[in-house]
Amino acid sequence: MARMVMCKKLGRELPGLAYKPFPNELGQRIYDSISQDAWKLWLEHFKMILNEYRLAPADPRTTEILYQQAEQFFFGENAQLPPDYRPPPSKG
């Protein structure tokens, strides 16, 4: 049975992550209070951040941006979108 957490992002009790996503205090906070569903939303948001800012995953600065964006996404008021971001056209 999945470990349940009161998800800070989605505001309800949902299955938690199976492991800490980052080896630091932020990773522990996410593990303790973010659900699998919210993590899936984050992965989509982070892909958008990587593409819009043209970040290189191997660049150490990308890791710092990842942590800042994750902190804002999960625990801040609202996640910031890149200034020139345009959502993709809807399918349908």
From Swiss-Prot:
A single MF term (Gene Ontology): iron ion binding
Swiss-Prot/TrEMBL GO biological process terms: cellular response to oxidative stress
SUPFAM superfamilies from the UniProt entry: YggX-like
Residues annotated as transmembrane: none
Domain of life: Bacteria
Keywords for this protein: Iron
GO cellular component: cytosol
Pfam families: Iron_traffic (PF04362)
Described purpose of this protein according to its UniProt entry: Could be a mediator in iron transactions between iron acquisition and iron-requiring processes, such as synthesis and/or repair of Fe-S clusters in biosynthetic enzymes.
Membership in a protein family: Belongs to the Fe(2+)-trafficking protein family.
Annotated protein name in UniProt: Probable Fe(2+)-trafficking protein
Origin species: Anaeromyxobacter sp. (strain K)
